Design a protein with these regions (language model features):
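Conserved N-terminal segment of class I S-adenosyl-L-methionine
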Residues: 2-131, 224, 229-252
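S-adenosyl-L-methionine-dependent methyltransferase catalytic module, highlighting the catalytic core
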Residues: 23-31, 150-159, 164-252
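Hydrophobic beta-strand segment of the Class I
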Residues: 91, 140-141
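An acidic- and aromatic-residue-enriched active-site/binding cleft used to recognize and process polar
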Residues: 117, 142, 174-176
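Short catalytic micro-motifs in class I SAM-dependent methyltransferases
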Residues: 143-148
Length: 252
């Protein structure tokens, strides 16, 4: 397609149509039977590699990563978590997950509220000061955010405050440190030295992360990719992902 014709097509078709067309083209280009992305429903020859070189990592259609696909697997198994008349918060919403989660909420009459500190088309939601009443949120998904917050314990307490008595918060963080203690940083220099990223404040040990969640008032169930059927793990290209399923530990 010539540059002139491409520019005319962009003028004639709405952005949403163009995005949908590009997605369908990617789906056709990468179609196969070996893998499946449960975030966008695409059947794939392979997932794309991570920039670090790790193979079969990124969905070429929607951009989902293994942690997202583990969370979707859990949510698709636990349809009862989507409550008619309730509300779901999606913190720092991943573009690849938003359409599927919005549809799952819409099907049961549940409000879907995507938001964070940044992000086009999302509410401004600060995990330290959520604009919701106590016990008013029924479901929350928050991936790789708490490890980037200077005061993660305050954020955990705020999440606990807004969760309904029967609510569920899925709070994922990246791969756990295998040493004795969580790696915690307080300065930019420390963050760059430890993680090569000024936005990351810590790398938890699994035990410490669970302890912090429990101290904030949650019952914690650990949902591990390695416990799933091997065929599903292979199709979704899950690694050693872990999902912490958090529910309020008694009334406030």
């Amino acid at each position: 397609m010539s540059g002139w014709l491409r520019s005319r097509v962009r003028q004639w078709l709405p952005d949403a149509w163009m995005a949908a067309m590009r997605k369908q083209l990617r789906r056709a280009r990468h179609w196969g039977l070996r893998h499946w992305c449960n975030a966008c429903g695409s059947r794939l020859r392979a997932f794309l590699p991570h920039p670090s070189g790790e193979q079969d990592f990124l969905c070429p259609v929607c951009g989902s990563k293994p942690p997202h696909r583990l969370a979707m697997y859990f949510l698709q198994e636990r349809a009862e978590l989507f409550v008619g008349g309730g509300q779901m918060l999606h913190i720092a919403p991943e573009p690849g997950l938003r359409p599927r989660l919005a549809t799952m909420c819409e099907q049961v009459g549940m409000a879907y509220r995507p938001g964070g500190l940044t992000g086009e088309g999302a509410e401004h939601l600060d995990l330290l000061d959520l604009p919701f009443a106590d016990a008013s949120v029924d479901l929350m998904y928050c991936c790789h955010v708490l490890n980037c917050m200077p005061d993660d314990r305050a954020a955990m307490r705020e999440v606990r405050r807004v969760m309904s008595r029967q609510g569920t918060a899925l709070l994922q963080v990246p791969a756990f440190h295998v040493g004795a203690e969580t790696i915690e940083t307080t300065t930019r220099e420390q963050r760059i030295a430890a993680f090569n990223d000024d936005g990351i404040h810590r790398c938890y040990t699994d035990a410490d992360y669970q302890q912090r969640l429990r101290a904030s008032g949650f019952l914690v169930t650990v949902y591990r990719a390695e416990a799933l059927p091997p065929g599903d793990v292979a199709r979704l290209s899950l690694k050693r992902e872990v999902l912490h399923v958090c529910q309020p530990d008694g009334p406030r």
